[in-house]
Amino acid sequence: MIRFLILAGYFELGMYLQLSGKLDRYINSHYSYLAYISMALSFILALVQLTIWMKRLKMHSHLSGKAAKFFSPIILAIPVFIGLLVPTVPLDSTTVSAKGYHFPLAAGSTTSGTSSDGTRVQYLKPDTSLYFTKSAYQKEMRATLKKYKGSGKLQITTQNYMEVMEIIYLFPDEFKNRQIEYVGFIYNDPKDKNSQFLFRFGIIHCIADSGVYGLLTTGGQTHYQNNTWVTVSGKLAIEYNQNLKQTLPVLHISQSSQTMQPKNPYVYRVF
């Protein structure tokens, strides 16, 4: 009976995350089919366990000892309780500060690329090179650059946010003096009051490889508070940042306006 309840709990957890829209805060929305597969398997296995319990069938068990029989169901049930009871809070600039984010320094620095809790994080530029061979990655990025190369206004949307940010950092000269417009939340640079980052939290595959991506902005007439969602438009320049000790693409804002937070504040990498 306990096995049936645990498996039914996994099915209900999947339903809850899907119907509440919270599943998108854990995995790339393009992988939601995996959640449906998991729900279907949990439901089928739950029915199997219910049948075994009702017919009182004797099944072979590899568990030996009272401690193993006691703790194994508890361990399996923990994710269900966490998923159902722990509130899901969207990541924002408070998270950026609380996790002790330090933006990447120039090559050769001693910064390890991990946050204060020991997890690997990505900053500013999405990096999908880990998922390709070197030649395949270069080919993929060149093909992506070809899609957005030009002199007209570049509109960065929720759908293309991750791939556009990646090629802007890889090929900044191709976008120099280009008019760019996009939406993000404000994160004030603690070391420079005149500079603000405009970010979105992005997920490549799941929350474990998530990062905060966007551009350093300057020149805006209005100084916004942290977590303010803003639509900005301006020209991209390439400048050396003294604090980060590297050359970065910087958006010189010509227009900005406060906007509502999107229903889903996250962006996802589409492959």
Curated annotation (Swiss-Prot):
Family according to the record: Belongs to the UPF0703 family.
Alphabetically ordered keywords of this record: Amino-acid transport, Cell membrane, Membrane, Transmembrane, Transmembrane helix, Transport
Name under which the protein is recorded: Putative two-component membrane permease complex subunit SMU_746c
Deleted gene: phenotype: SMU_746c-SMU_747c deletion affects biofilm formation in a medium- and pH-dependent manner. Mutants show a reduced ability to grow in acidified medium, but they survive both short-term or long-term acid stress. Mutants have lower glycolytic activity. Deletion does not affect membrane proton permeability.
Function: Could be part of a two-component membrane permease system responsible for amino acid transport under low pH. Involved in acidogenesis, biofilm formation and low-pH survival.
Assembly information from the UniProt record: Interacts with SMU_747c.
GO terms under cellular component: plasma membrane
InterPro entries in UniProt: DUF1980, DUF1980_C, DUF1980_N, UPF0703_membrane_permease
Membrane spanning residue stretches: 34-54, 70-90
Location(s), subcellular: Cell membrane
GO biological process: amino acid transport
NCBIfam families (alphabetical): TIGR03943 family putative permease subunit
Main subcellular location: membrane
Membrane topology listed for this record: Multi-pass membrane protein
